[in-house]
Every structure is written in structure tokens, then in C-alpha cells.
Amino acid sequence: MEEVEAANRSAIESCHGVLNLLSQRTSDPKSLTVETGEVVSKFKRVASLLTRGLGHGKFRSTNKFRSSFPQHIFLESPICCGNDLSGDYTQVLAPEPLQMVPASAVYNEMEPKHQLGHPSLMLSHKMCVDKSFLELKPPPFRAPYQLIHNHQQIAYSRSNSGVNLKFDGSGSSCYTPSVSNGSRSFVSSLSMDASVTDYDRNSFHLTGLSRGSDQQHTRKMCSGSLKCGSRSKCHCSKKRKLRVKRSIKVPAISNKIADIPPDEYSWRKYGQKPIKGSPHPRGYYKCSSVRGCPARKHVERCIDETSMLIVTYEGEHNHSRILSSQSAHT
């Protein structure tokens, strides 16, 4: 370890000698190159001493990072020559203050504290800022940010959805949205000082204004007569009429499926359908007393009592009662 410490001390002393040469105004490039080579060789010796007992250790030299700045600006000594800096180096300029600042914020002129050989390389931050600037409040609108006309208004309204947006630039920097639908309305005021003024105690209350409810009044139901503009089959949505159903239990007159108890109307059978879990099918009948009558009924045998029939009527007759001797035609 003593040998490593001695080699390290010698390398550091040589490095200080190179730094002193760099800080001088007039330095010979040849001597600087020689001193730098000696420093590198001494540090390599230190690295070889450190890796001597670690087996097959290898010293890998990486590419040196080349900075675009001259090396003597990083020295502690402030003695630098302004002529050494060329115009090719990147100039570090002091950041300009923001444009939108409060009226109470006062910025003094920048006074250089440390000048490093070039007028553009200066570090200074002397600035008097009002306390209100630290509260991060957006400044009020001034004349350049106002609209050209004081009473210019941009309004967007839609009657179906009931949305009315109004932007008013007359004197105040206030955005007032209003959403109204009938008797429900609210007005919220957003000012630029991050305060919300709500006149209805419901700030940002989004009411679900459904378009479907408004469009239901304007949508016309298609009658199926191909008047909706389509040449082929009409695909318009039709509302299925809600038919009133009523069921009664009557005794069966025979064991035949076609025999049904008579009533005051004439019926014609137009189909039947098997019932799951029952050996007897369900018969479907339509009123045949008057042509075009919408009344229907279906008859099925009761599962619990085979001697009883369940008759379910659907729809209403559009004619008066007609007594008939023959109740069903098979």
C-alpha cells in the first residue's frame, strides 16, 4: 500500500503542475503536452499497482469526454484572458425574464458578479420580486390581451341539447358557461385569480342532457309504406304495440284439440306450437267475424287439470259482438 500511495501522490503533484501551466497566460504547448503525458503514465502506474493482486485484471481506457468549453474557465483562479475565448465556443447567456409578469414585480438591471473573461459569460441574479408573484397567480388581462372590441361576444348555442356558451370580453376577464335545459340552469364564474364563484351552489354540475329525449319528438315513426326513402325493405325502428292479454280457464268440451268452447265471436285457427313439458300443443286463433280485426287468442290444455283449457285473449276487437253458432273453423 505504501508504494501505491507514493505513486498516487506523485501523479497528483504532476497533475497540479499541469493545472498551473493551464492557468498561466503564456504557456508553451510543447511543455504542456510533455507534462500531460507524464501525468497519464503515472496514473497508469497507479492503476497497475491497484490491479496487481486481482488476478487477470485489465485496465480499459474509455474515450475521454471532450467539452465544448475551454478548460481554463473551470479553474478556481479568476485570472483569465478575454482574448482566449473564440467565437466558436457556445455562449451561455443569462435567461431573459418572462414576458407575462405582474405589474408590481420590479426587475432591476442585471449586475455581473463574476465575469469570466467574456461579456456573455456572467452569473448574476439580482432581482426584486413582489410577494404576490410567488403566489403563482396569473396576471390580470392587460390591453394587449383584450379583444379588439370591448363588447365582442362569441356565443355558441344549440337548441336540441340546451348548451349555451358565452364568451364576453367587456372589461372583465371572466368566463361564464351556462348550461340550461328547461327550468334547470346554473351559472358558474371562473375568475383568473383561481377563485370559483357559483351562483347556484353547484359548481361544475354536469347534468346529463340526453339527445335521445329531444330527438324522440322530431323522429317520425315509419308506417311501413316505404315512404322513408328506402327502395327495399324498410329498416326504420317501429314501436311494438303493447297488447293487453287476459287469460281465463274454461272446461274442455272434448278430448279433441280442435274443439274449443264457443264465445260471442267467430275464430279461425292459423297455427299451433308444441309446449315444452306438455303432450298437448297450443293453438292460435284470430277473429274471423270482421275482416282485419286485430283480436287474437291462443288455447292450451292445463297441465295440472287436463279437463280444463286456458284461453288467453290478446288485442281488442274493432267491431261489435256477433253471435255465431260455429265458434271455430279448422
Swiss-Prot record:
GO cellular component: a single term: nucleus
SUPFAM superfamilies: WRKY DNA-binding domain
Molecular function GO labels: calmodulin binding; DNA-binding transcription factor activity; sequence-specific DNA binding
Keyword DNA-binding: yes
Predominant place of localization: nucleus
SMART domains: WRKY
Keywords: DNA-binding, Nucleus, Transcription, Transcription regulation
Function: Transcription factor. Interacts specifically with the W box (5'-(T)TGAC[CT]-3'), a frequently occurring elicitor-responsive cis-acting element.
Protein name: Probable WRKY transcription factor 39
